[in-house]
A protein has these predicted regions:
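Conserved N-terminal phosphate-binding loop of PLP-dependent enzymes in the Aspartate aminotransferase
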Residues: 1-196
């Protein structure tokens, strides 16, 4: 495909490895290369609930500013579970693009959204209508869920903190089989020493 013809290259970076991150940005922002975007999740549930550190995210966003590289925060799983509604707010960053979905429309209407900052939102009004219409239902589901999430943010945070605290307590009491607790609040995972 495109990668075989030298037109693009997708480059993964180890989570929380700031040295590798810096090396990749240095390598791919010179000569014939230019980073097109930095895609990331804050908590990678498919990787044992690995959580990107504050330091790593701050460094990544600084490199993106330096190299004029858009940031794309995948908030499909994390949004609404944060008392700040979006996890990026907890990290103190503002992505160029945020992708939301799953729980955000409250389970009432299956829909995902891509939110752009003003610099990247260049489509004219109605420039990207969907084929089958009915976007007003999805939009309403999002707005209702957003209002509910804002009204219940304190409870969401408290329940999530309690859940994480209880998981960490469980891990400390059962350190034989349990290696660690990863993630944050509702989005947490239990790592075992063995899967025996």
């Amino acid at each position: 495909g495109l990668e075989n013809h030298g037109l693009l290259r997708v480059r993964g970076v180890r989570p929380n490895d700031e040295k590798e991150l810096e090396a990749v940005f240095a390598e791919y922002n010179q000569g014939r290369y230019k980073t097109a975007a930095f895609f990331h999740e804050f908590i990678m549930m498919n990787y044992g609930a690995a959580r990107l550190t504050d330091s790593y995210i701050r460094r990544a966003y600084a490199l993106c500013r330096k190299h004029d590289t858009p940031t794309v925060a995948d908030e499909i799983q994390t949004c609404v579970w944060s008392p700040e509604i979006f996890m990026f707010r907890e990290y103190g960053v503002t992505p160029s693009i945020a992708v939301v979905g799953k729980g955000f429309p409250g389970g009432e209407y299956p829909a995902s959204r891509i939110l752009f900052n003003a610099a990247l939102d260049t489509l004219p009004l109605f420039g990207a209508l969907v084929t089958n219409g009915q976007e007003e239902l999805a939009s309403l589901a999002y707005l209702v869920t957003l209002r509910w999430a804002e009204a219940n943010a304190e409870v969401t945070g408290a329940v999530g903190d309690y859940y994480e605290e209880r998981l960490r307590d469980l891990a400390s009491r059962h350190s034989g089989p349990l290696a660690s607790i990863e993630g944050r609040r509702h989005l947490a995972g239990i790592n075992f020493h063995e899967l025996g």
